[in-house]
Amino acid sequence: MDPYKYRPSSSFNAPMWSTNSGAPVWNNDNSLTVGSRGPILLEDYHLVEKIADFDRERIPERVVHARGATAKGFFEVTHDVSHLTCADFLRAPGVQTPVIVRFSTVIHERGSPETLRDPRGFAIKFYTREGNWDLVGNNFPVFFIRDGMKFPDMVHALKPNPKTHIQENWRILDFFSHHPESLHMFTFLFDDIGVPADYRHMDGSGVNTYTLVNRAGKAHYVKFHWKPTCGVKSLLEEEAVTVGGTNHSHATKDLTDSIAAGNYPEWTFYIQTIDPDYEERFDFDPLDVTKTWPEDVVPLQPVGRLVLNRNIDNFFSENEQLAFCPGIIVPGVYYSDDKLLQTRIFSYSDTQRHRLGPNYLLLPANAPKCSHHNNHYDGLMNFMHRDEEVDYFPSRFDPAKHAPRYPIPSRTLNGRREKMVIEKENNFKQPGERYRSMDPARQERFINRWIDALSDPRLTHEIKAIWLSYWSQADKSLGQKLASRLSSKPSM
């Protein structure tokens, strides 16, 4: 059934003003009163409806990724990957799929400046012939934590102090001092790329490890990457202050203006793949979201290109009501046992049901563009017009049947029930390698940002010592420089 066919806006084109129920409104300027100066009458239904509507215009803000910008376009396959996946939208070079993409900051509120040091969200909804696929990622290829159990605590630590509503370094560094796996993420966040110049000049990553499955059922672990064809650009501190002080929505404006001018943003889509049969060859766990896969060992393979060539028509319906979930996949793409991904599969859909209601997938931006059929009926704000008499399965009165079976990973798993960390933590090697890959000037800026963070007057000597130990294990010279600068810095 076409979800657009019965949407309320299909008849929202009257030349005269009316109420929500369609009654004509002859005066939208004055309230109904007793005389010209008398009290307002409660029977002024139009006034009550208008104010009540206004009072309910805002919906719950996203708990993370509240500040965002959206655009539409297409994804086109440029290289054959049919040997790796049976996904229909990747079936052959030249195949195009419509998409909608949402960029965002992560921690800060809706309306906050787009020049703050913060990860950026990079989420794509592919409207494929086999249903939607949501690839929900960030601009950095790694994350702070590897187990979803810590996600609420992590967000609380990064968010403002619940007493003062001020984001404070002592809270952030206190929490992450218990999680050395966060070091790798901090080599990105405190690097020059921690403040992207705009959304067009920004990398994207699926972050988590997924699985590609071909028609024969062979599975490969996969990492997804987006590289902007116009290159990566970032803002240093002084530039961020200048840009943010001029326009706190500069990245949204840049995206909108560029598309309107025909300067369409474009990214090349790459994958990295690992055969699960050989995952033990690495000194890290391929399912560890705090690790990257070395490109000299696991090379990037080009797959396609993403082009954004249309601005959205309505911010609320195509940004605020737009909803993503890593659990929404298509045949040929599957999950992995990445602990953070496993948590996200539930968390994202759950928060959308809270934010938008149980029928959020019926909203036009979230509904599939292919035909679909199930017995998910009724519920709050279900506006789908259905005239079936059979709302159960199976039935001899309803011709709907199971879809053809498609392959999913078939590995046999065994183990004890237990709560524990992964065996190959290896928390310090990759952060050290990334720091050493920076040129001296970039290293100096990285160190200065850490000196500033570690100089928070509420940080204890113990917490500072832990961070110096962590960075020394990543790179001895880095630890020494941080210790030297901190010891010579006058106390408050």
Swiss-Prot record:
Homotetramer. CDD domains: catalase_clade_1. One of its GO terms (biological process) is hydrogen peroxide catabolic process. Occurs in almost all aerobically respiring organisms and serves to protect cells from the toxic effects of hydrogen peroxide. This is Catalase-1. GO terms for cellular component: cytoplasm; glyoxysome; peroxisome; plasma membrane. The gene is CAT1. It catalyses: 2 H2O2 = O2 + 2 H2O. Its main location: other. Belongs to the catalase family. Heme binds at Y348. Its cofactor is heme.
